[in-house]
């Protein structure tokens, strides 16, 4: 599996260390193991996880500006855990309302010695951080409108929303609230993944 991940990463411009590769593979192994009992993801095959979960997450690492990030509706830690492994100098809060997911993330953080992740069990509307985040990340929301509406209280003054999407939809943009606008759309190239992926960056209007 390690060799397969190295081959996938070689098809991108990402730079990874041996330790990062070991941690990413370790995460997939733990996810595969826990998934049998806890049903954390619909993806069952570890090789498929490498593409749909690891590569789909880590390609975003090149676009993160700032130090403090929150992954809302992280599920089993996606994209938060792979991003934290790729960006050890940044801090990631991983938010989910389901206890089994947060227990899994705590186990991952402990076993793989990931120092820059804070798992939080909470509904997003009830979570009140002491300070805002530079980036609010999610691939969990059905629409960007849902994302910015539920997470409006989370960005810092100059913070952004980072929505991981499949197709980029002008219809979704039209449905955004007036206080929010799309500042950038970045097509993401993910080796061996069928279908298009986009990172949509949204900002509150001043």
From Swiss-Prot:
Cellular compartments annotated: Cytoplasm
Binding annotation for S-adenosyl-L-methionine: 73, 78, 124-125, 139
UniProt xrefs under InterPro entries: rRNA_ssu_MeTfrase_G, SAM-dependent_MTases_sf
Function: Specifically methylates the N7 position of guanine in position 527 of 16S rRNA.
Gene3D superfamilies linked: Vaccinia Virus protein VP39
Organism: Photobacterium profundum (strain SS9)
Entry keyword set: Cytoplasm, Methyltransferase, rRNA processing, S-adenosyl-L-methionine, Transferase
EC number: 2.1.1.170
Any one Gene Ontology molecular-function term assigned to this protein's record: rRNA (guanine-N7-)-methyltransferase activity
Protein name: Ribosomal RNA small subunit methyltransferase G
Reaction catalysis annotation: guanosine(527) in 16S rRNA + S-adenosyl-L-methionine = N(7)-methylguanosine(527) in 16S rRNA + S-adenosyl-L-homocysteine
Pfam families, per the entry: GidB
